Amino acid sequence: MSCKKSARQSLYVSLCLFYILVFAAATEVDFYSPECHSHTYEIVLNSFSSIWLLINLFLLLCSFAIFLKYWCYKTFASETVKGY
């Protein structure tokens, strides 16, 4: 039961951090204005596309980690039983 509670708390903390990152971003600056320079342009994280990109990046990294875990375990198991 405590494992579920711990997972729920960590999910809550990560969602709070995500909310802070998304909604505490600086106000948008017109990227094409002459006063804006590309090296000083601030990335805004409260648009739909940036949130969608972050979610997709998170899912991609999780799926990559799961695949590598499976692949490494499969290789380890086949190498281990090869001697028997």
UniProtKB/Swiss-Prot annotation:
Record topology, Intravirion segments: 69-84
Entry superkingdom: Viruses
Complex formation: Interacts (via N-terminus) with gM (via N-terminus). The gM-gN heterodimer forms the gCII complex.
Residue ranges annotated as Virion surface topological domain: 27-47
Annotated compartments: Virion membrane; Host membrane; Host Golgi apparatus, Host trans-Golgi network
Protein name according to UniProt: Envelope glycoprotein N
InterPro entries in UniProt: Herpes_glycoprotein_N_domain, HSV_GN
Gene that specifies this protein: gN
Role: Envelope glycoprotein necessary for proper maturation of gM and modulation of its membrane fusion activity. Also plays a critical role in virion morphogenesis.
Main location: virion
Membrane-protein topology: Single-pass type I membrane protein
GO CC aspect terms: host cell Golgi apparatus; host cell membrane; membrane; viral envelope; virion membrane
Signal peptide (UniProt feature, chain positions): 1-26
